């Protein structure tokens, strides 16, 4: 697949500088791009690569255009432009292209137009698959689960029963949605399992990375709103709610009944306590331990930044003595006040 620069400019609302008839076949980095490639510059610290780049064209801002020695598409945000061009030139194969003979599909499953189901997939009774849904090899879709149009599951995804997924969703391999939440009562040391009777409701245009787990609700559904993106190896516990447009980076853990607002950004390996709320537009940096609600938009961090082992040992020793140091300081302050 190829587009001329003029065609790409029309798609992006960009301005062509150079030969608009040149064909672009793929995207590449500034350093590695060659003939037929388009690249981008979104950070001026990489501007020096422009002089040596062999790209056919560069996505660039008006401010950086004087430094560009080749053809260019000028637009406000080159990185967003790159993302859209990459979509147009995407050569990623589909999870499945037809219904494989080895797929096991219950008799009452409702299949939309052009549905594809890969080898050894299992689709149970009561499932509804919208138009252009793609189910990869080895997937399991449990009873009464619904997938909206154009949603895709890569190989070996598991959707338990009573899951609702909207349109244009993408789930990467190994992810499990709808397993039991961690719900138990304790009676004199004996754990009594609480059946998890809710489901999982996932909105439209949600993307979920590989090997992530999203538990079903205890009584009501776990909810993921529209336009949420979740990275690999995250744990979303029962009855968590994640608001519109929030991004969750890899290895994040969210305990039960956490409510995350709209447009939040959650850094990797963050840990959240349950039964609390995070307000809209909160940014939590990586490795944070969030034990209390966040009520004001802003950037939040916790943890000790990287040090040499020797420095870290000194810091740890001082932290262990902080209560003792506080008491000594208080005594000194009182003594000074008395004098």
Curated annotation (Swiss-Prot):
The active site lies at 238 (proton acceptor)
The record's keywords, sorted A to Z, are:
Acyltransferase, Lipid A biosynthesis, Lipid biosynthesis, Lipid metabolism, Repeat, Transferase
Q: Which GO terms describe its molecular function?
A: N-acyltransferase activity
Give the CC-aspect GO terms: membrane
Q: In which pathway does it act?
A: Bacterial outer membrane biogenesis; LPS lipid A biosynthesis
The family classification in the record reads:
Belongs to the transferase hexapeptide repeat family. LpxD subfamily.
Q: What is the protein named?
A: UDP-3-O-acylglucosamine N-acyltransferase
Q: Which organism is it from?
A: Aeromonas hydrophila subsp. hydrophila (strain ATCC 7966 / DSM 30187 / BCRC 13018 / CCUG 14551 / JCM 1027 / KCTC 2358 / NCIMB 9240 / NCTC 8049)
Lineage, highest ranks first: Bacteria, Pseudomonadati, Pseudomonadota, Gammaproteobacteria, Aeromonadales
Q: Which gene encodes it?
A: lpxD
């Amino acid at each position: 697949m190829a587009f001329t620069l003029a065609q790409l400019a029309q798609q992006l609302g960009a301005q062509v500088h150079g030969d608009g008839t040149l064909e672009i076949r793929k995207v590449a980095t500034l350093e590695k791009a060659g003939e037929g490639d388009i690249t981008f510059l979104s950070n001026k610290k990489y501007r020096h690569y422009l002089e040596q780049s062999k790209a056919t064209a560069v996505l660039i801002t008006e401010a950086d255009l004087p430094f560009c020695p080749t053809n260019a598409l000028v637009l406000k945000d080159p990185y967003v432009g790159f993302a859209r061009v990459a979509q147009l030139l995407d050569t990623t194969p589909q999870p499945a292209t037809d219904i494989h003979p080895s797929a096991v599909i219950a008799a009452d499953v409702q299949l939309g137009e052009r549905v594809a189901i890969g080898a050894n997939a299992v689709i149970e009774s009561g499932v509804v698959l919208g138009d252009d849904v793609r189910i990869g090899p080895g997937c399991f879709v449990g009873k009464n689960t619904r997938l909206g149009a154009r949603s895709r599951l890569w190989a070996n995804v598991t959707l338990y029963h009573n899951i609702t997924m909207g349109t244009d969703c993408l789930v990467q391999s190994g992810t499990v949605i709808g397993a039991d939440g961690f719900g138990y009562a304790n009676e004199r040391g004996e754990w009594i399992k609480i059946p998890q009777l809710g489901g999982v409701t996932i909105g439209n245009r949600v993307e979920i990375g590989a090997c992530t787990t999203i538990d079903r609700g205890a009584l009501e559904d776990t909810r993921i709103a529209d336009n949420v993106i979740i990275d690999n190896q995250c744990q979303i516990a029962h009855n968590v709610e994640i608001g519109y447009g929030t991004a969750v980076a890899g290895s994040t853990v969210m305990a039960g009944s956490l409510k995350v607002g709209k447009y939040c950004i959650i850094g990797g390996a963050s840990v959240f306590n349950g039964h609390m709320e995070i307000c809209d537009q909160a940014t939590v940096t990586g490795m944070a331990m969030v034990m209390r609600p966040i009520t004001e938009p802003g950037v939040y961090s916790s943890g000790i930044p990287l040090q040499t082992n020797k420095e870290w040992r000194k810091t740890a020793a001082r932290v262990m003595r902080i209560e003792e140091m506080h008491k000594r300081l208080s005594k000194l302050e009182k003594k000074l006040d008395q004098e």
